[in-house]
Design a protein with these regions (language model features):
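Cytosolic juxtamembrane helix and N-cap/initiation of the first transmembrane helix
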Residues: 1-16
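Core segments of alpha-helical transmembrane spans in multipass integral membrane proteins
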Residues: 15-19, 37-61, 75-82, 112
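Alpha-helical transmembrane segments of multi-pass membrane proteins
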Residues: 17-28
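Membrane-interface helix termini and inter-helical loops of multi-pass transporters
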Residues: 27-35, 93-100
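Short aromatic-rich membrane-water interface segments that cap or initiate transmembrane helices
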Residues: 39-42, 101-109
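Mid-chain, well-packed structural core segment of small domains
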Residues: 64-93
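Membrane-helix boundary connector in multi-pass membrane proteins
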Residues: 86-106
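Membrane-water interface at the C-terminal end of transmembrane alpha helices
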Residues: 108-132
Length: 132
């Protein structure tokens, strides 16, 4: 597997986490996101999403195998996807959009974004596993 493809994916995942949180939370001032899911999307939770973004960037700088690191990343993304699906089943996106468009957009896309990067991390994991 081309290391450049892996690096681009890791950098993109980091950008989505860091820039996405800063943009949609309006630099941690959008309380509608916090109140829509106070456990997962508190300002602390949003900060931890950004920390995961930094971890993805750090992984892009590693020149050896990152097989088990991306496995952990895939599990992390899986957890967020499950939480997102549960949130969608128990809440109304339409109501959230009426409160704040950025919060509505955030909750509309974050799980899909995490699902896509989960698949990417799994792809890297299995490719590095088969390359041994």
């Amino acid at each position: 597997m081309n290391k450049n493809i892996i690096n681009i994916g890791l950098i993109a995942a980091g950008l989505m986490n860091i820039v996405g949180v800063l943009l949609f939370s309006r630099a941690f001032t959008n309380t509608v996101i916090n109140s829509a899911d106070p456990v997962v999307m508190s300002n602390f939770g949003l900060l931890m999403i950004m920390v995961w973004g930094l971890a993805y960037w750090g992984a892009a700088a590693v020149s050896s195998s990152i097989q088990w690191m991306v496995a952990a990343f895939a599990v992390e993304k899986f957890v967020y996807v499950v939480v997102w699906v549960m949130w969608l089943n128990n809440n109304s996106l339409a109501q959230l959009y009426t409160k704040d468009v950025f919060a509505g957009l955030f909750f509309s896309i974050y799980g899909l974004n995490d699902f896509i990067f989960m698949l990417f991390f799994l792809w890297v994991f299995f490719h590095q596993r088969s390359s041994k």
